[in-house]
Amino acid sequence: MLRGTPGLGLGGLNRAEDFVEDLGRSCSEAGRNFGVLRRSSLDEAEEAAGRKRERPTRSKARRMAANVRERKRILDYNEAFNALRRALQHDLGGKRLSKIATLRRAIHRITALSLVLRASPAPRWPCGHLECHGQAAQGSSTGNSSFSVPRSAPSPIAPSLTRRDIASPLVPPTPRCASCSPHSHLGRPRVMAEVPNLAQTSGGNWRQCPGAPPVRPVSWRWGSGLGYQHS
């Protein structure tokens, strides 16, 4: 058979034998590697199965309780969103707002109400919110720290004095009756006060008051109070 093969010599036969030997060695090495891989994969599968067996198994009652809690949480979540949609009073032709759209509308609504409250005057009645009472207490504490006692207002002028009487501090006021006025010492100067039993009428004339005692001469001096003082 080798004789009929054209172009093959001793060199060709040697190369063919070497190729066969290399192929046999590579096949044997591949078989050994395959066996190693198979054993390692089996070991890993056994370890994974062992870990799964070591994990504590949950009972059916615990799984049912967890499912009930999850359903209740989702139900409360949906009820809260439905209440928020009703508070916003949206009108989409029977359609329901999505959760993201509901939250966005709620944010815009709260912002608008905050602006209205800041622009409106202070309420005339006490507020019943605990947050407002806390803010009021803080405001009062800060206000007391910066509060200063106001200065006492000047004493009011005697009610019997009119604007005409106190117009000029240099001229003593004119009493309606020289003998009946409680502030007779604030009458005219000495020139007019020395006239006995006379009182000035509305027309500027002087007359004597009925039943009035004679008026003594009154001396006037300049005082530190409301102009002239009786001496």
From Swiss-Prot:
It is found in: Nucleus. Residues 61-113 form the bHLH domain. GO terms for molecular function: DNA binding; protein heterodimerization activity. Residues 137-149 have a biased composition (Polar residues). It comes from the Eukaryota. PROSITE patterns: BHLH. Pfam families: HLH (PF00010). It comes from Mus musculus (Mouse). Residues 135-168 are annotated as: Disordered. Its main location: nucleus. Transcription factor, which play a role in limb development. Is an essential player in the regulatory network governing transcription of genes implicated in limb morphogenesis. InterPro entries: bHLH_dom (IPR011598), E-box_TF_Regulators (IPR050283), HLH_DNA-bd_sf (IPR036638). This is Class A basic helix-loop-helix protein 9. The gene is Bhlha9. SMART domains: HLH. The keyword DNA-binding applies. GO terms for biological process: regulation of transcription by RNA polymerase II. GO terms for cellular component: cytoplasm; nucleus. Heterodimer. Efficient DNA binding requires dimerization with another bHLH protein. Interacts with TCF3, TCF4, and TCF12. The lineage of its organism: Eukaryota, Metazoa, Chordata, Craniata, Vertebrata. Keywords: Developmental protein, DNA-binding, Nucleus, Transcription, Transcription regulation.
